[in-house]
Amino acid sequence: MLFALCLMTGVLSSCGKDTSSTETTKKDDNTLVILNYGKYIDESVLDQFEKETGIKVKLEEYESPEEMYTKFSAGSINYDLVCTSDYMVERLINEDQVLEINFDDFEYYKNLDSSIIEASQIFDPENKYSMPYFYGTLGILYNTTMVSDEEVSTWNVLWDEAYKDSIIMQNSVRDSFTPALRLSGYDINTTDENQLNDALDLLIRQKPLVYAYYVDETGDEMAMGNAAMALVYSGEAAYAMELNDDLSYSVPEEGSNLWIDSWFMPKSCHNTEYAEKFLDFLCREDIGMLNFDYVYYATPNLAVKENLDEETLSDTTIFPTDVRCINNMTSTRQSYRIISGKN
């Protein structure tokens, strides 16, 4: 029997706190309820939006796209805006859970890079349902005093028994499957049941070597020297490298993927005018800069990039140029089904 990967047990350990309320949120006509990754927006941005518009913002947080889908599907909270990964945006579009965004009245949407908007057509073909927020790659953050550059040139190092109890993996099904699929020579978006099970077998074999499955804690753990390497998003790697000069980042030769986190308006949105006003606000140069400085991931906001120094712009950990990632930005449709029951 086939189940969604988010129901899989035995491969990933759950971790972290639940930052959302378990009670149904009472809708205030003057309040936007937003669901976003943890630590993924500068809260001063929310304060400034409230001050300028008089519209209140209630922020709910989650750790993984699978957790987001569970929260969203429960229906106990009527969200007005959600930020999540590209493949989950596509899933919800296909499930007819998403409203069209009217960009015609946006004043600052023009600040967004047209190439990133075009890349978003992989999961939002007409760019009608989503707005890009940040983008980046998935790779290996490693401590150069423990691991050589040559070793991290391949995903195979994540299965090296010499690093038992010193490997951090992502507590996200999609991301954990990426290295296993690439190492096996498979497309990261495969829907082939046998290929997915091959990757699952690799992850099960890897589990005894893993120090922990994290999301938000990875950068800090690596900065403190608690592990030799970690599967991370590029922005998290850049953050950790600022804290520890011994850290470096690599996209293995087998390739990875370029991801685009995006905002969408669910059908539970009670005031599309306010929601669209908030999205346009995020596109402003000053607001985009606040968010970039806080999150430190690649921003699609060209007005922000014009004000960054050359050292930052040329840092490929932040702004990826590796074609091995860009060429893997392909459709994720229905790539989350496997045989369950293995552990």
Where are these regions (language model features)?
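A bilobed periplasmic-binding-protein/Venus flytrap-type ligand-binding module shared by bacterial periplasmic
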Residues: G139-M146, R182-L183, W259-N271, F281-L282, ...
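Periplasmic-binding protein-like
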Residues: L196-R205, Y211, L243-K267
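Early extracytoplasmic/lumenal segment of secretory-pathway proteins
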Residues: E23-R91
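Bacterial signal peptide processing site
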Residues: G16-D18
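Extracytoplasmic ligand-binding site segments that recognize negatively charged/polar headgroups
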Residues: Y40, N78-Y79, C83-N226
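Mature extracytoplasmic/periplasmic domains
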Residues: P266-I326
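C-terminal motif of bacterial Sec signal peptides marking the signal peptidase cleavage site
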Residues: G10-S14
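A ligand-binding cleft/hinge motif common to bilobed small-molecule-binding domains
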Residues: M88-R91, A223, M229-D246
